[in-house]
Amino acid sequence: MYKRQYLAKAGLNVVVLEKNDYIGGAAVTREMHEGWFYSSCSYVCSMMRQSIHRDLDLTRHGLLLVPYLGTVNFSDRGDRVLIDYPDEEAAYLELRRHSPHDADAMSRFQADLGRYAQLIRKTLLRTPPDPSSFKPRDIQELLWMAKQFWNLGERELYEYIRFFTMSAADFLHDYFEDDLIKAAMASPGIIGTALGVYSPGSAYILLHHVMGDVDGNVGAWGLARGGMGAISHALAGALKEHGGEIRTEAPVNQILVKNGATVGVVLDNGDEVFADIVVLSLIH
């Protein structure tokens, strides 16, 4: 979603083709009933880097993120309630009401997750290397990644490998004993997946919910004022400010290829759009 804004900011002539009559893809706010608007797909902002927010000056384009203030969880019989408070002391007391052991374990759990996230956070804005390539850029990137793991040390490297391959349930069992607390903590490990909490690798998904930040608060989630479509409209404003163009109701019918390279597209109405660089998000 962000690459088009950076291309336009760098001085390139950018044209965005959108098949719908609105922009945003999954980050949209739609009028479901007259006068009632709803974030119909993406519902919360957690992984949007604040460096991007600042680079594109999205606040000036109308984007305001409001901190997400927590959740309420019920036991399967409905006889117990666990409230996730944003205030640290209130959250501790709520956990202690269910399990003093788990309340004391939470700080260790959060510290370990933060440590794992710190390594991954370094890679988010880097280009993944091609391990089969001998190009200097790919070799340099592979060496950089190897250095990050080498610097961990043998014991910590073992802990990282174990974490990235284990299930969310097994990871949570290492810290907590109360089933309601574990259930509440496990749900972020399967959101957006077809996995269960015992699926290998699901522990890693927990990191996706502590790697983001809202207004400098690392690990926080945010709600966009005006719905998630406000993010897309702010990005559109940044694109247009740098000379970019957005065409809605412009579905792509055909990809144009010449000498093995993509050179443009043909729209449903027959219009041909040519470009030196074509970035596609089509589903095949």
Positions of PLM-derived features:
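Conserved small/polar residues in nucleotide/adenosyl-binding loops
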Residues: M1-Q5, I283-H284
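N-terminal glycine-rich phosphate/pyrophosphate-binding loop and immediately adjacent elements
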Residues: K3-S132
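Hydrophobic beta-strand scaffold positions of dinucleotide-using enzymes
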Residues: I52, V279-L280
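Active-site/ligand-binding neighborhood in enzyme catalytic cores
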Residues: G114-H242
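General beta-strand structural signal in soluble alpha/beta enzymes
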Residues: A183-A184, T248, L267
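A conserved short coil-to-beta-strand element within the FAD-binding core of flavoproteins
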Residues: T248-A261
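Core beta-strand elements of the Rossmann-like FAD/NAD(P) dinucleotide-binding domain
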Residues: D268-I277
